[in-house]
Every structure is written in C-alpha cells, then in structure tokens.
Curated annotation (Swiss-Prot):
Cofactor entry: Mg(2+)
EC number of the protein: 3.1.-.-
Superkingdom classification of source: Bacteria
Binding-site residues for Mg(2+) 2, renumbered to this chain: 16, 508, 723
Subunit: Monomer. Binds crRNA and tracrRNA.
Broadest EC class assigned to this enzyme: hydrolase
Protein family per UniProt: Belongs to the CRISPR-associated protein Cas9 family. Subtype II-C subfamily.
Domain HNH Cas9-type: 512-667
Protein encoded by which gene: cas9
Entry-linked HAMAP family: Cas9
Name of the protein this chain belongs to: CRISPR-associated endonuclease Cas9
Alphabetical list of Pfam families matching this protein: HNH_4, RuvC_III
Record-level GO BP terms: defense response to virus; maintenance of CRISPR repeat elements
Gene Ontology molecular functions: DNA binding; endonuclease activity; metal ion binding; RNA binding
Length: 1082
C-alpha cells in the first residue's frame, strides 16, 4: 500500500477529550482563519484508568493481594523460624517432624493449653503448640499513640476491640488473653476468633507479650525444663518484631524532588509554611464580583483576612463577607451560589496549625485564648517529622532535641499527617514573602525562578512529547491526556502541523470519582425534574401537539418563578397564550452579543414587544438605572420579589458591565487540566497559526450552544461517534467565527432561544437557524454525513462505509457544494486502544474443595448471607438434611430471595424435640468444575481469572483457539490445547507442529470473520472457553447492532476467513497483520 502523502493544509485541530474517549476533527481555514472545509475526523476510545464501579485505582486490587501474600509469607517464615528454634533448644526432636518439616501429632487445642499452662506443667508437644499459637496469632501492635483518633471505620473498630479487651484484662477477672477468650468469648458468642467484619475479639500484642512472660514463669515453677533464657528471648523476638512502615528517606525517595529546587525534597503539606502558601494562593486569587465588574481584594481587605484562618478553626466565605463588609450585591467568584447556603463552605482551614494547637490544649499545655506559641520554623519541623515518619520512636528521634518532652508527648498522642506538596520548603520560603506582598503564585515564581512551571522546555518540536506523570497525578486524567497526545501526533504524522489546536475537556475530566458520581446524581435529578416539568406542562396544555421541547418547559418554569408577570413591563402573562408564536419570548437579560452568556441565570420571560424594545441593552441601561428612574425601581422590585436564586437576581440587576471579562469567562474553559494542556502544547509543539495564542480551551456550554444553532443532533446513547461531532464544533469555534456570530446577534437583536428574529426594515420574521452564521454552506448536512455515514434523520439509510460510497453520497446530497468531496474523505471508524497486558489476577479469590474434581464437581462453603435459592438447590447433603433445606428455603422465600435480609438474624438448627441447637452460618454447595487453578498444594481449586490472550491456529481450513490465562503467564506455561466445544480441557485438541500459527488476539484487537452467512468486522471482545466462540465489539458500539453493540457467539472454527488487522490511533490506517512466529508468554 502506498504511503499517504497529503498536500500541505492550513487547518485547525479540534479535540473533545473525555475520561475514556478523544474525539478529533480537522477543519481547513482560510487566511483570515475562517473555517471553510471539513478535512477529516475520528474517535479514539480507551478504557478509563480506574475500576469502573468503585473508582479505585487499577493497582489497588494488586496492591491489596500483594499485601496479603506478603503477610502470609511472613507468617509462614515466622513459624518456620519458631520450629527451628524449638528444635535447636531441644524442645522437639527430629522424630517429631514429618518430611515437610511440620510437627507431627501437634495438639489442636492451643487456647485450652494456654489456659492450662497457668496451672500445670505441659508436655514438650503441648508447650510447642502454645508457643507456635502465640506467634501465629500475635494480635495487633500499635506504633502510634494517636491511632485511636483515626477516621478509618475498620481501623477504629479494631482499635476499640483491642482497647475493650485490654480493659477487661486490667480488671483482674482474667489472668491472660487465653482465659478471657475461653471464659468470655466462647461462652457469650460461641466462637473465639473474629468473624466477618467483627474485631471485638482482637488482643493487643503487648497483652500477649505479658501472657508469654507469665507462661514462662509458671512453667518454670512447674518444672518444665524448656524455659531457657535463649528460648524465651527467641520466642519473644518472633512475637514482637514487626517491619517498620515506609518512612523517612524511603518516603522522600518515592515523592521525588522540588519543581524549582531539584536537590530539595518536597515539603509536607501540614507544615506552617506550606499551609501559609496555600492560604496566600487562595487569598491572592480571590475575586469579588460586584455590579458586573470583577476585582481582586484591596491591600486593606487582604490585611483584614490575612490572620483570620489562625484565629478561627475554619474561615468560611460568610465570615469573610462579614469581615470585609461587602454589600449584598457583591459575590465571591467561583462559588456555586445555586446550592443552599453556598457561603457556609470553607474558604480556608489551617489544619496542621489548629491540630497542634488542639493537641496542646488537650494536655493543658496551651491557653485557649492565646495563639500557638511555636515558631514557624519549629512548626515546619513538626509537620515534616509527623508526615515522614510513621512510628512514635522515629518521630521522637527526629524531634527530641527540638521540643520539650511534655509537648512532644502531647503531639504524639493527638496528631498524624501524611500529605505533601510539589515544592520544597526552601522554595516556599523564597516565594511566600512575595505572595505576602500581594503577588500571585505565578508572578512570584516568575520573579524568582523565571517561570511558573520551573525550568520549562521551550524547544518546539513537530510531535508532542509524553505527558509528564509527575505533573498530572490523577491516573484517569493522565491516561486521557496521553491518548489525546497520541491522536495529536497521529494527525501531525498524517497531515502535517496544524495552525491551531482547540481543546474541550468533558467536565468530569479532572474530577474525583466521588465528584463524578455527584455530577451523575445531579444529572439524574435534573432529568427527573425535566420529566416532572414536562408532565406539568402537559397538565396545563392538554391539547399541545407532540412532546414539549426544552424551550416550552423553560417558559413555564420562568412563568412560575416570575409570578406570571413579564419581568420588563410587569404586565400579567396570559398562561393560555404561553405557546402562542411571538406572544412571549425568552430573553437574555444581559445581551448574548455582549456576554456570550447562555446560562439559566441570564434568561427571563418577557412579552415579545418588550423584548424588541429592549434590544441590545442591559436592564440597567434599558430602564435608565443611572438616574434611578421609576421604571428601574419597579423593575428591581419585580426581580427582588421573584423566585429567582440569589445569584440570578444579582446578575439581572448588574449596573457596571465588563463585556470583555464576561466573554472571556464564557468562551474559555480555565480549569487546571485545560490550562495545563494548553500551556504544555503551546510550549512544546510547532504550530503554524498567526498570533501568540494558538491553543484555545473551549467552554463546553458554548459547544452545546453552537451545536444546537448549527443543527447538529447529538444522541450519546446511540454510539461512540458523537465525540467527533463535538470535535468539529470545537474546531470551528474560531475567533473569526465568534466575531461573525457576535455581529449577527447584535445586528438582528436576536433572542438566542426564540428561533426567530425580526428584520426591522421589513418586519419579516426570519428563522434563526437559516440565517445564523454557519461555518460554511450545508455545514450540518455535511458534518452529519461525515460522522454517521448517512443523512441525518434517516436511520434506515445504508451506511456509506467505504471512501467511494461516502464520496458518492456527499456528491448526491450536497451537489451544490463540490468542496465537500475531496481526497481526504474517508468513513469514520472508531479506533479502540488494545489491551496487550499479559499480567493480571491469577485466579479468583474463592478457593473450593477439589476432593470430587474427578466427578467434575467442586464444593464451596457459602455464607448464609450470600446464599440464593439457586445455590440452595445444590446444597451438599440436601437429601440427608431435609429439615435444614426446607427451613433455609422458607427463610429465603419469605424475603424474596434476598439472603442479606433473610439471614440478618442468626439461623439455628433444631432437634427432634424442637429445641434450638447449633447456629448455622454457612452451607456447602456443589458447583460444576471442569477446569481451574490448583492451589494449596493441590488441596483446593479456584476458577480461572483473566484470559490475557488467545492464540489462533489453522489446519485443514479450520481455525483453533488456544486460551492463555494470567496464571500460565506467571508460571511461564505456553498452553498447547485448543478449545473443543463441550469437552473438558484434558480432552481439548492438542496443538502440534502440523498446525500453523496465525496470530495472537488480545482484547480490542481488530478482527475480521467471514462465514457463509455474513462478514463481521470489529474488535475482539472475549472468547468462550466452553464453546470456542468469540464475541466481537462493533467499532462504534452501535447499540442497535447485536447486544448493545456486541456480536455474541461467533463460531470461527469453520469460518471461510479469520484475519487480524492493525489500526492506528486515528482509525485511518487499517491493514492485515503480517504473519509472525508464536510469541512466548514471558
């Protein structure tokens, strides 16, 4: 295939970046940077870098499993050393051990023996059982005095159990934890060990240490010869030794170094200097919106607030308002006034300062009324020590020569820190003095270090370098930006450097999982509100034809908020005429042409005649507010008595009016992710456009507005192509286009949501969508065909899925626009990032009994709280215990097969006389088990977990699939058995040298399967090991095809053709994979 070599193109690249997708579009521009032609577009889809259901890091499951393996391994090694010690000290002889090094005939009643050891001499085997039991179950050892103040619920429950049991031992009713366990736990709850999620039976390791010492003393009294000092010291060391938590230099090594001072470590966030830096950043960036103008705090206002966070545990916006003496018409920029009591939220909290202060107060070392009497340098040292070190011993070692012993003891009891900032204390101490003078962070950095981002690489390159992981800590954002980089470089590689890059990031990008869930919750609430409003609208207007549109519902909503009156004239609005054409209009109170503000807070309901009279003025200008006219006073009264939110009232009543500021805020997205990406691209990438600002972050609200004006229909639920639709709009949002729209709106005195304008000279009603400035003629029709491969509104139309078909369709439908047909026109094919990772979960967590595996059955112990009716039917010994089966079934049926509710109360067996006997907590259930992973020395079996690869072989015009699991990769096993439908793995087809290797499949590899019935072309989703069939994901995940965009159960063994393809990030270069040798698994 010949290389693609386009002619030089002057174009803008538009990007629509989400947390799992990047839509892109190239729009050619003329010399004045007006969009003139759609060159190319596409979508890149990838898996978000988090667990979808929980938002946890993808590494968390591995990290937790690794921690469990380490704990198990360390426990096993501890017991091994204990057995060796027992043998070395003569407690046990060689004959007491089996071939695996385990002790033969070891008593299995260690709790009882621990109690008996207080009153009689134990035999060597009994004494060994006691010592090994103490080392195996050695309780909890706290290394910090303040752990009891944790916010972690699980740790809190554990610490409570430890404290309660320590208190019970101190009462003197029980000599040792073993006596407490036997005489209290076992008698009261029927068990000694902790049960699921319960930590009330946990002991302190120090209490177990005291028991060990007492047992040695008692056994010595009873004449036990095996109580030497060496044995006691060795056992006590094994009991008490614990690996220290990662701290000190190890923590600093992981954190890295300062952005500005590369030789310096990053500062702890809970130091005095770091907290002051954070406060000064907020203070110097705080903006007041008043009468339409935006201003920073004056020097006097800054001085008023400067020390308030030290005086108050939390400084709120409401408190700041009172201290500054702000008028009711003034508001804090960036605060969401739509929610209740917005100013009750915290402006600044000096957490470390007040934590230290409270700690000293609790121990009587500080006067409640006096400020904290510790120097900033000492507070920095305290914050650093408590952040870096994790044990009282290490913290004491760092601070003992700096702080009085009683102060250090108070701090150890009550504080704990663990967060860091990106800058060192050395850099902060240089930057903070300038910020105290009123300079912003970037200004202070520029004065000292020359740049906000430290030493910036200003070399412009053709391709964008990798996104620095140390600057973008959120893995979800890092993956999204990294994929966007791949798309940018792919476009440059194919078409050359762009003139400009326009970026829009979805609002969830950069948000935490919790915040994104809150956004989803609000969206769902808004959807329900719209449904209620639509239902209410239909009640008011039962004869309304069709479904009410958002504009209709908005009219009713505004009508109610304005008490049924025109906001401009005060005249009553006839509700029955609400839908009458031209009777009422939705107006932008602050003219759209001067603000680009299309938010709800800028919309009011007025009579059509009033709207035309107001024209391009603000209400303040229209009603002659500068002379405080009677009309202005009446208007103010109507606004104040309306049901508008406070922020909307303030906006409508604006007097001073900063047009440039409004436009800048509404046209640009200034979130950190956008600022970072724009700066990163602008600093490092060669762009050919005019002027300095060649990278622009578009506001999503403006994209939505323009998409509607330009007639582009977006349905997210249909498929993944809609991301490209937004990218086209983002690319076309040029400065020249914005100026055209502004001039049009100003000239026509338009209403942005009325759908019509009035020509003043002729009085003719002009339909807005016809006359609203378009990037080019037939823009909407061309874009919809390019994105979806068919005309808009014609789902039955066959998709033009080849360049020839697409060009023919464009030529037929847009005969008046020959420019739409050019050499770069190709169908949109969604590119999906393949997952070629070969590691993963080795096997499922549940280990089942393998005693009956030769029957194809495994046995699993299922807790009653997880037992469903379908599981109950497979209960072991169901025929032998019919009463138990019937009782369990009745309980489940009574609670509609909800085991959590059914067995919230304990369940007991009953004897023939009807007396309650044994509590049942779980039952054994049979499961079909044809394969799995052997564990626990072939005593248990677990289900396979991740199928990381499928190798495809061919022989005699038939295809054979060999699944490869992560556990096989870990062991270096390259399987040689191909799936045979309905057979056990041992009976699968053996792959020998007579088979030809074709290719390896990973999730999201592009494949083509041709059968006698159809051709299927899409992304490999999964393979069914029971049937040998595969599932293929449609490239755009069109939900109308297959099952939610997935073609399931495709048999490939007898396929006419089965081929794997390579695809680039843009979805443009698609070619068959070359034949290779079968790759190893490691």
């Amino acid at each position: 295939m010949a290389a693609f070599k386009p002619n030089p193109i002057n174009y803008i690249l538009g990007l629509d970046i989400g947390i799992a997708s990047v839509g892109w579009a190239m729009v050619e521009i003329d010399e004045d940077e007006n969009p003139i032609c759609l060159i190319d577009l596409g979508v890149r889809v990838f898996e978000r870098a988090e667990v979808p259901k929980t938002g946890d890091s993808l590494a968390m499951a591995r990290r937790l499993a690794r921690s469990v393996r380490r704990l198990t391994r360390r426990r096993a090694h501890r017991l091994l050393r204990a057995r060796r010690l027992l043998k070395r000290e003569g407690v046990l002889q060689a004959a007491d051990f089996d071939e695996n090094g385990l002790i033969k005939s070891l008593p299995n009643t260690p709790w009882q023996l621990r109690a008996a050891a207080l009153d009689r001499k134990l035999t060597p085997l009994e004494w060994s059982a006691v010592l090994l039991h103490l080392i195996k179950h050695r309780g909890y050892l706290s290394q910090r005095k303040n752990e009891g103040e944790t916010a972690d619920k699980e740790l809190g429950a554990l610490l409570k159990g430890v404290a309660d049991n320590a208190h019970a031992l101190q009462t003197g009713d029980f000599r040792t934890p073993a006596e407490l366990a036997l005489n209290k736990f076992e008698k009261e709850s029927g068990h000694i060990r902790n049960q699921r999620g319960d930590y009330s039976h946990t002991f302190s390791r120090k209490d177990l240490q005291a028991e060990l010492i007492l047992l040695f003393e008692k056994q010595k009294e009873f004449g036990n010869p095996h109580v030497s000092g060496g044995l006691k010291e060795g056992i006590e060391t094994l009991l008490m030794t614990q690996r220290p938590a990662l701290s000190g230099d190890a923590v600093q090594k992981m954190l890295g170094h300062c952005t500005f001072e590369p030789a310096e470590p990053k500062a702890a966030k809970n130091t005095y200097t770091a907290e002051r830096f954070i406060w000064l950043t907020k203070l110097n960036n705080l903006r007041i919106l008043e009468q339409g103008s935006e201003r920073p705090l004056t020097d006097t206002e800054r001085a008023t607030l400067m020390d308030e966070p030290y005086r108050k545990s939390k400084l709120t916006y409401a408190q700041a308002r009172k201290l500054l003496g702000l008028e009711d018409t003034a508001f804090f920029k960036g605060l969401r006034y739509g929610k209740d009591n917005a100013e009750a939220s915290t402006l600044m909290e000096m957490k470390a300062y007040h934590a230290i202060s409270r700690a000293l107060e609790k121990e009587g070392l500080k006067d409640k009324k006096s400020p904290l009497n510790l120097s900033p340098e000492l507070q920095d040292e305290i914050g650093t020590a408590f952040s870096l070190f994790k044990t009282d011993e290490d913290i004491t070692g760092r601070l003992k020569d700096r702080i009085q012993p009683e102060i250090l003891e108070a701090l150890l009891k009550h504080i704990s820190f663990d967060k860091f900032v990106q800058i060192s204390l050395k850099a902060l101490r240089r930057i903070v003095p300038l910020m105290e003078q009123g300079k912003r962070y970037d200004e202070a950095c520029a004065e000292i270090y020359g740049d906000h981002y430290g030493k910036k690489n200003t070399e412009e390159k053709i391709y964008l370098p990798p996104i620095p992981a140390d600057e973008i800590r959120n893995p979800v954002v890092l993956r999204a930006l990294s994929q966007a980089r791949k798309v940018i470089n792919g476009v440059v590689r194919r078409y050359g450097s762009p003139a400009r890059i326009h970026i829009e990031t979805a609002r969830e990008v950069g948000k935490s999982f919790k915040d994104r869930k809150e956004i989803e919750k609000r969206q769902e609430e808004n959807r329900k509100d719209r449904e209620k409003a639509a239902a209410k609208f239909r009640e008011y207007f039962p004869n309304f034809v069709g479904e009410p549109k958002s504009k209709d519902i908005l009219k009713l909503r505004l009508y109610e908020q304005q008490h049924g009156k025109c906001l401009y004239s005060g005249k009553e609005i006839n509700l029955g005429r609400l839908n009458e054409k031209g009777y009422v209009e939705i107006d932008h109170a602050l003219p759209f042409s001067r603000t680009w503000d299309d938010s709800f807070n800028n919309k009011v309901l007025v009579l059509g005649s009033e709207n035309q009279n107001k024209g391009n003025q603000t209400p303040y200008e229209y009603f002659n507010g500068k002379d405080n006219s009677r009309e202005w006073q009446e208007f103010k009264a109507r606004v104040e008595t309306s049901r508008f939110p406070r922020s909307k009232k303030q906006r409508i009543l604006l007097q001073k009016f900063d047009e440039d500021g409004f436009k800048e805020r509404n046209l640009n997205d200034t979130r950190y992710v956008n600022r970072f990406l724009c700066q990163f691209v602008a600093d490092r990438m060669r762009l050919t456009g005019k002027g300095k600002k060649r990278v622009f972050a578009s506001n999503g609200q403006i994209t939505n507005l323009l998409r509607g004006f330009w007639g582009l229909r977006k349905v997210r639920a249909e498929n993944d192509r809609h991301h490209a639709l937004d990218a086209v709009v983002v690319a076309c949002s040029t400065v020249a286009m914005q100026q055209k729209i502004t001039r049009f709106v100003r000239y026509k005195e338009m209403n942005a949501f009325d759908g019509k304008t009035i020509d003043k000279e002729t009085g003719e009603v002009l339909h807005q969508k016809t006359h609203f400035p378009q990037p080019w003629e037939f823009f909407a029709q061309e874009v919809m065909i390019r994105v979806f491969g068919k005309p808009d509104g014609k789902p039955e139309f066959e998709e033009a899925d080849t360049p020839e078909k697409l060009r023919t369709l464009l030529a037929e439908k847009l005969s008046s626009r020959p420019e739409a047909v050019h050499e770069y026109v190709t169908p949109l094919f969604v590119s999906r990032a393949p997952n070629r990772k070969m590691s993963g979960q080795g096997h499922m967590e549940t280990v089942k009994s393998a005693k009956r595996l030769d029957e194809g059955v495994s046995v699993l112990r299922v807790p009653l709280t997880q037992l469903k009716l379908k599981d109950l039917e497979k209960m072991v010994n169901r025929e032998r215990e019919p009463k138990l089966y019937e009782a369990l079934k009745a309980r489940l049926e009574a609670h509609k097969d909800d085991p959590a509710k059914a067995f919230a109360e304990p369940f007991y067996k009953y004897d023939k006389a009807g007396n309650r006997t044994q509590q049942v907590k779980a039952v054994r259930v049979e499961q079909v088990q044809k394969t799995g992973v052997w564990v626990r020395n072939h005593n248990g079996i677990a289900d396979n977990a991740t199928m990381v690869r499928v190798d495809v072989f061919e022989k005699g015009d038939k295809y054979y699939l060999v699944p490869i699991y992560s556990w096989q990769v870990a062991k270096g096993i390259l399987p040689d058995r191909a799936v045979v439908q309905g057979k056990d793995e041992e009976d699968w087809q053996l792959i020998d040298d007579s088979f030809n290797f074709k290719f390896s499949l990973h999730p999201n590899d592009l494949v083509e399967v041709i059968t006698k019935k159809a051709r299927m072309f899409g992304y490999f989703a999964s393979c069914h090991r029971g049937t040998g069939n595969i599932n293929i994901r449609i490239h755009d995940l069109d939900h109308k095809i297959g099952k939610n965009g997935i073609l399931e159960g495709i048999g490939v063994k007898t396929a006419l053709s089965f081929q794997k393809y390579q695809i680039d990030e843009l979805g443009k270069e698609i070619r068959p994979c070359r034949l290779k040798k079968r790759p190893p698994v490691r």
